Amino acid sequence: MIDGALGMAYGVSLTTFLLSTGIPPATASASVHTAEIFTTGTSGISHLKLGNVNKELFTKLLVPGMIGGIVGAYILTSIPVKIIKPFVALYLLLMGVIILRKTFKKIEETTTPRAKLFPLGLIGGFFDALGGGGWGPIVTSTLVARGHNPRFTIGTVNLAEFFVTLTEVATFLMIMGLAQLQIILGLIIGGVIAAPLAAYVCKKIPSKKLMIIVGILIITLSVKTIYQTML
C-alpha cells in the first residue's frame, strides 16, 4: 500500500523487519525482492491503466536500473551492507528536506536529461538490491526534488521497479538459490491486495500533498536508519 501510493518504502520497511527477526541480509533481500515481482507487477499495471506512467522516463530508467540491481545483488553476498547504509540514509535525508522545501514554493515541472537519468537508475538499482530496498526512495525522491510531477514519477518508478526486481531476483537465484518460501508467500498476498488501491490513491491525491507525504516518509526512514547504524 505505502509503496504503490508513494513509490517507495516497501522493500526498506520489510527488510528492516526481517533483519530484526534474525534473518541474514542476503536472505531478507532475496525474499523481499522475490515477493516484489508480484507486488510491483500488480502496482505497475495499475499505474499504467490509470495513466500514471511517463513512457519516455520509463525507458530511460529501465536499463541502468537493471544493471545496478545485478551488481548490488552480487556484492550483497560478500560485503556487509552496514558499511554503505549510513551514506545512503544521509543522501535520502537530504532529498526529503529538499522535497519538503519545494512544497512551500512554486515548482516548475521539468524533465531530466538522459545523461543524468542513467547514473540515477544505476545507483537506485544498486542500493535497492544491496539494502533490500531503495529503488523508490532514491529514484522517486531525486526526480521529485528535481521538479518532476509526483504522480507520473511515482507511477513510472513503480512500473520500472518490476523489471529491476525481476533482474535482481534472477541474480540472487543464480548465486544462492530460492529464499524462504513462507516469507515470500506472506509478502506476496499482502502486497498484491493493496497495490490496486494504492494506484487509485496516487491518482486522486493532489501533487503538493503527495510531496509532503513523500518528504516526511523519507526523512523519517532516513533518521531511523542513521540511528540504527549508530547503535
Could you say what each language-model-derived stretch is?
Residues 33-45, 93, 133-142, 164-167:
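Hydrophobic, membrane-facing alpha-helical anchors
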Residues 155, 168-171:
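Feature detects amphipathic, helix-rich regulatory segments
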Residues 129-134, 157:
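A short glycine-/small-residue-rich loop at the edge of a beta-strand within enzyme catalytic domains
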Residues 36-37, 102-107, 162-164:
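Short acidic/polar alpha-helix capping motifs at helix-coil junctions
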Residues 5, 40, 112, 162-163:
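Accessory recognition modules or surfaces
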Residues 29-37, 154-162, 192, 218:
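Transmembrane helix-bundle signature of multi-pass membrane transporters/permeases
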Residues 1-5, 9-21, 25, 46-131, ...:
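Juxtamembrane transmembrane-helix boundary motif
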